[in-house]
A protein has these predicted regions:
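Conserved catalytic core of nucleotide polymerization and phosphodiester-bond processing enzymes
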Residues: 1-202
Length: 202
């Protein structure tokens, strides 16, 4: 089948279409089953843990509380019992959009998924409230940026940010996770607008 036959005229990139076709293409052996699952609130768990400075957020999970209510309560300076459904939804969108250094654009995109539509100035205010309620976030993002920048400039040396490490070897930037897995950013280099690396869409 040719690419133009599977990609609608005004649709997605070929790589996005192929990615969405991967799971349906996998078939279990006879008598076996695949189990598909999703980590609960993984976005809210992983970045504070990686930062080594997000214990307040992680404590919400330890106590079995609703993370989106807890975040909204911190954002709007309320008791958790006083958080409305609308405020919880804002907290949810903020958690999903902002944890990986997302800003107003990420908030707006995630808001569309969950039916939250705010004017730009309100979206910015909400992002700012999330960042203030999660003091581990901005310093961790800064540490990550400094670490990968220094790694690119100093090949062969290891630089740490929270629980992760960066090292440039040859043309590639390597990102070591606490699990022992290593991600590769091929041909990482500096460009005028920041760091660039080879992506599947190239």
């Amino acid at each position: 089948m040719r690419g133009h036959q599977i990609v609608p005229e005004f649709g997605k990139r070929v790589t996005d279409v192929l990615k969405s076709m991967l799971r349906p293409a996998l078939l279990p052996a006879p008598g076996k089953s695949f189990i598909v699952y999703d980590w609960s609130s993984i976005e809210a768990r992983v970045t504070p843990w990686l930062s080594m400075d997000g214990d307040d957020t992680l404590q919400v999970f330890r106590e079995g509380r609703d993370i989106y209510v807890a975040v909204a309560a911190r954002m709007f300076n309320l008791a958790e019992a006083d958080v409305t459904d609308e405020q919880r939804q804002l907290g949810k969108v903020a958690v999903l959009a902002c944890g990986f250094a997302g800003g107003v654009g990420a908030f707006a995109a995630m808001g569309r998924v969950y039916g939250v539509h705010l004017p730009e100035h309100e979206a910015k205010r909400t992002v700012d409230l999330w960042r203030k309620a999660n003091p581990w976030a901005v310093p961790f993002w800064s540490d990550l940026e400094q670490s990968y920048t220094r790694a690119i400039r100093n090949p062969g040396e290891v630089f740490t940010a929270g629980r992760v490490q960066y090292m440039k070897q040859g043309d590639h930037l390597w990102y070591a996770l606490p699990s022992g897995r290593v991600l590769c950013y091929p041909y990482a280099r500096f460009e005028e607008d920041g760091v660039s690396y080879a992506k599947a869409s190239w």
